[in-house]
Amino acid sequence: MVEGHTDDVPYKTGAVIKDNWDLSVMRATSIVRLITAHKGINPQNITAAGRSQYEPLLPNTNADNRSRNRRTEVIITPDLASIERMLQDISID
């Protein structure tokens, strides 16, 4: 999963981006497009999500913190069925 994040400053409404929700989704989808186009990742195996301003790393109390909150995160989730099979194989040995 790729998550896009923003700070809490309202986005100035534009023709394409309406608010921080749109901006966070666009951040995530731009990374997803790069990964699927250039790294051979199957688009069925990746998700883009926008978190807007609602999961800040730091309080949005100054410019430096707001800058750190404007980010994109790549979250790698394991295939749980594969892990379960590996654990079963270990317990059998």
Listing of model-derived features with the role each one plays in the protein:
Residues 5-93:
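Periplasmic OmpA-like peptidoglycan-binding domain that tethers envelope proteins to the cell wall
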